[in-house]
Amino acid sequence: MGITETAAPILSNPLDPAQQQMGSPGIPWGNDVRIANELGAPLSTGHEGEIQVQGPNVMKGYFKNETATQESFTTDNWYRTGDLGWMNDDGYFFVTGRRKELIIKGGENISPREIDDVLYSHPAVLEAAAVAVPDAHYGQEIAACVVTKPGESVTVDELQAFCVVRLGDYKSPAKIQLLEELPKGPSGKIQRLQLVQHFAPINPTTMSS
């Protein structure tokens, strides 16, 4: 795992397959990596937070953009990747999503990938992506877009009931749209934030009053 701002990988799995852990981009590679909360305080193993990196391969800042530079570094000079994740007891990191894609419902942080994983487990679902939409009561509510497998069919009600059993009411999508395809970038990654346009705000009458 690497990003432009580090000019090199920050996490990598060992070459020995026996030391690799499935689903993890690996352990720190030539730098220091930590998980931190919203205030920049380090979190212990097993706790989800932002992946932050520090080391000689990290950029000094964005060219002629001091504002972006200040926003991207903590006061103790850790670069904020914007990726969310956690570290296990063996020191391996796991990525769970992006900070800007986090759903904040009623003050609770909900990773959209948690909803994605449940939807992907449905036998009729080919692709799925959860997003945050404005809500008058909670601030943000959960919505999701789904593409079904060829030859398969499923209703919105069936998908919502499937989620409620596995996630409970609070974390289940209030709205689901069935689409023919999901928008993707050049690398094939789903452009999650583009999906928001498919949903009107929840409780729009209340929100405008």
Roles of regions detected by a PLM:
Residues 1-32, 44-49, 58-60, 74-76, ...:
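Conserved ATP-binding loop and adjacent catalytic segment of the adenylate-forming AMP-binding
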Residues 26, 50, 101, 197-200:
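A short acidic/small-residue loop/turn micro-motif
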Residues 66-70:
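A short helix/loop element that forms part of the nucleotide-sugar donor recognition site in Leloir-type
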